[in-house]
Design a protein with these regions (language model features):
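Conserved aromatic-histidine-acidic binding/catalytic patches
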Residues: 12, 60, 78
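Short Cys/His-centered divalent metal-binding micro-motifs
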Residues: 40, 44, 68-95
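Short Cys/His-rich Zn2+-coordinating modules
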Residues: 14-26, 50-58
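Short Fe-S-cluster ligation motifs
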Residues: 65-78, 97-119
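Short metal-coordination and nucleic-acid-contact micro-motifs, chiefly zinc-binding Cys/His arrays
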Residues: 17, 27-35, 64-68
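A boundary/linker detector
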Residues: 1-23, 103-131
């Protein structure tokens, strides 16, 4: 018998974070190997992380595909995301001013409904399953 329990918002956000992280790492991998956006370390996509230029606390950029790039644990955790290198590499890859635009976008307040979060989970899960 299916449960009619409503899934909590925090569980939905966590699920979206997980599937979006997989998507970013798979999207940027070749033969299951990916390169750290800031230091260039190459490793299996499962051993790398989804690094954010603008903090995950900003919902407007938390699931932004430009704001999120593959990073090794050394850069993402121990070197606090290597923000300067991250910004330089963003501008090199996506065009001058990209890092500044993301900084501005991060300050915009957005409110996602649970339905919108569930929809994003489905979209990114489909991408991950097809990769």
């Amino acid at each position: 018998m299916p449960s009619n329990k409503k899934v909590s918002r925090s569980k939905l956000v966590k699920k979206l974070d997980t599937v979006f992280s997989q998507y970013i790492r798979l999207k940027n991998s070749v033969d299951e190997m990916a390169t750290c956006f800031t230091c260039g370390k190459v490793d299996h996509w499962k051993k790398l992380q989804n690094g954010h230029f603008q903090s995950r606390k900003h919902y407007s950029t938390r699931w932004d595909e430009v704001n999120c790039q593959v990073q090794c644990a050394g850069c993402n955790v121990f070197k606090y995301g290597e923000q300067y290198k991250f910004s330089v590499n963003l501008d090199a890859k996506y065009g001058e001013g990209t890092a500044e635009r993301l900084s501005i976008k991060a300050q915009q307040i957005i409110k996602l409904s649970n339905f919108e979060i569930e929809d994003m989970i489905k979209i990114y899960k489909n991408f991950v399953d097809s990769m």
